[in-house]
């Protein structure tokens, strides 16, 4: 163990760390050179003062540098949320990923098990016969052959094991609760990313800009969800050409109706999988409209659609033509063969 982190903990409590200082601090953490007390001290100093964009970018850059990387085709994007919104909705970002892939955009989706939901993305994919616990080689095969791959965080970020026990003991949100969407192992340059609070969308968008993203939408629903909501207004921080612009979006902007929140509440993994299969079959529902809205946004970010209405049409075609279902079946086959 090293004492190099001690002065940085004190500095972090008093003032924002420079990007170089933050990179040094997180390198020490990820190299396993900090004690549990030092890790907790740094994380709580940052949380209490409030993390800066430079600190987010530094932590994410170090985490990316130490990950088990994936080579993704040009133009691949991520569709992901921070999780932690506590709303227990149906699996919207996961379904969106398959619909967007069915529309011809390669999706390199990064995620983890969602401890705040009855059924996270890993649970839904398991119900659909997809093995999420695969390494970079299998993910690369899936991206190239199926046009979609899922990267489970523990399989790609082994260095975070050094901080997990302390995070569990702290039992509160820290910088690590937002690092997942900022540390895609495939290094994608385009993202549709949900945040559990509106306050994070601009700083996360600015962080992705510092990390080299070309275009990204950071979103939060007015109902508290970490995605574009079908129940009313959503807030968006849109990164494009190095600048961030904040806008409000409404389902009607995409030609979609508003639905009550109760219509998108999820259940057990089995119940959510049943809803997902019905969506793939083309059944009309609030769930379908929520997925169409988010898929439309992703297709705009990917430059596949000029606006949300065109994106909705492309997303609906992906579902109704069977292309979205074909992506589920292809990913299941490739990942099961890897067992």
Curated annotation (Swiss-Prot):
Keywords assigned by UniProt, alphabetized: Amino-acid biosynthesis, Aromatic amino acid biosynthesis, Glycosyltransferase, Magnesium, Metal-binding, Transferase, Tryptophan biosynthesis
Q: What is the catalytic activity of this protein?
A: N-(5-phospho-beta-D-ribosyl)anthranilate + diphosphate = 5-phospho-alpha-D-ribose 1-diphosphate + anthranilate
Which residues are involved in binding anthranilate 1? 81, 112
Q: Where does Mg(2+) 2 bind?
A: 226-227
Cellular component (GO) terms are: cytosol
In this chain, Mg(2+) 1 is annotated as bound at 93, 227
Q: Where does anthranilate 2 bind?
A: 167
Please indicate which superkingdom the organism of origin belongs to. Answer: Bacteria
Q: Which GO terms describe its biological process?
A: L-tryptophan biosynthetic process
InterPro entries given in the database record: Anthranilate_Pribosyl_Tfrase, Glycosyl_Trfase_fam3, Glycosyl_Trfase_fam3_N_dom, Glycosyl_Trfase_fam3_N_dom_sf, Nuc_phospho_transferase
The UniProt record gives the binding positions of 5-phospho-alpha-D-ribose 1-diphosphate as 81, 84-85, 89, 91-94, 109-117, 121
Q: In which pathway does it act?
A: Amino-acid biosynthesis; L-tryptophan biosynthesis; L-tryptophan from chorismate: step 2/5
One family from Pfam that matches here is: Glycos_transf_3
* Group of enzyme by EC: transferase
MF-aspect GO terms: anthranilate phosphoribosyltransferase activity; magnesium ion binding
EC no. given is 2.4.2.18
The cofactors it requires, by name, are: Mg(2+)
Give the cofactor note.
Answer: Binds 2 magnesium ions per monomer.
Subunit-level organization: Homodimer.
Question: What family classification does the UniProt entry report for this protein?
Answer: Belongs to the anthranilate phosphoribosyltransferase family.
Protein name according to UniProt:
Anthranilate phosphoribosyltransferase
List the source organism. Answer: Ruegeria pomeroyi (strain ATCC 700808 / DSM 15171 / DSS-3)
